[in-house]
Amino acid sequence: MGGKTVTRADLAEAVYRKVGLSRTESAALVEMILDEVCDAIVNGETVKLSSFATFQVRDKNERIGRNPKTGEEVPILPRRVMTFKASNVLKQRILQEHQKRETKSQK
């Protein structure tokens, strides 16, 4: 089920092949895009990439957790977390690819 991990270099290479920019320009473009996304998220903005996903920062309140070894209650401090919500388009593509692979493996 697992596959290759796609890196920044892989994205830059794909831009190089598909867009025709130089490798240096492609890598710089990927970095600029990722920097913009990161800056927006850090500033608490929601980043919505249609047909892909939404990245959002949420505040979580303090709550009581439990140490699994001792059972002792431990306070979990309030914090900010980033959430990733895949779009319905992406979810559908994932499902279709899974179904194709399942069909091939049954033959």
From Swiss-Prot:
Any one GO BP annotation for this protein: DNA recombination
Transcription regulation is among the record's keywords: yes
Query: Which keywords describe this protein according to UniProt?
Result: DNA recombination, DNA-binding, Transcription, Transcription regulation, Translation regulation
Could you tell me which InterPro entries the record lists for this protein? Hist_DNA-bd, Histone-like_DNA-bd_CS, IHF-like_DNA-bd_dom_sf, IHF_alpha
Enumerate the GO terms in the molecular function aspect. Answer: DNA binding; structural constituent of chromatin
Q: What do the Gene Ontology cellular component annotations say?
A: cytosol
SMART domains documented for this protein: BHL
Q: Which Pfam families does this entry report, sorted A to Z? A: Bac_DNA_binding
Q: How the protein assembles, per its UniProt entry? A: Heterodimer of an alpha and a beta chain.
Family, per entry:
Belongs to the bacterial histone-like protein family.
What does the record give as the function of this protein? This protein is one of the two subunits of integration host factor, a specific DNA-binding protein that functions in genetic recombination as well as in transcriptional and translational control.
Q: By what name is this protein known? A: Integration host factor subunit alpha
